[in-house]
Amino acid sequence: QAARQVDTLFVIPVKEDRSEFSYTERKAMLEAGCRNIGNVIVCEGSDYSISAATFPTYFLKELDEAATTQMSLDLNLCAKRIASALGAKIRFVGNEPFDAMTQRYNELMHEILPLEGISVVEMARLSERDRAISASAVRTALAEGKFSEAAPKVYPTTIPYLLAKLATMAL
């Protein structure tokens, strides 16, 4: 949906290696999923975009005044350094029905980015049986060895990565 609204859509993966899938794996999944969308560029992640360097409380999931300050710093860096370098005037983001930290980040995005000339477009997540799909649900299904629950929640090009993860877990 986002790619239809702009000439070039830049996708910037979070560079931190703090999940079940490494940055390299996540970037490869994004590249595979976007391969046939001609105007999408999957960029290298940055140490200055939703990173432990600028936004450590995101990874601690502590929603407090420090977190809000760090979110503001992260969003200002995004606007003044990253978006300006790319010439990006719109930031697309998925809505967040589950995580209070990310909900607050989205709220601040709507406050801060327009001041820098960047529109924010918040899009509804894909859903399954009237429930928004989350990465947490996929991770939980994988941890429980329930591939049949995880697979419908991801893009088809991601399935080989899920199978590889399950195979590694089985060893």
Where are these regions (language model features)?
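Nucleotidyltransferase catalytic core that binds NTPs
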Residues: 1-171
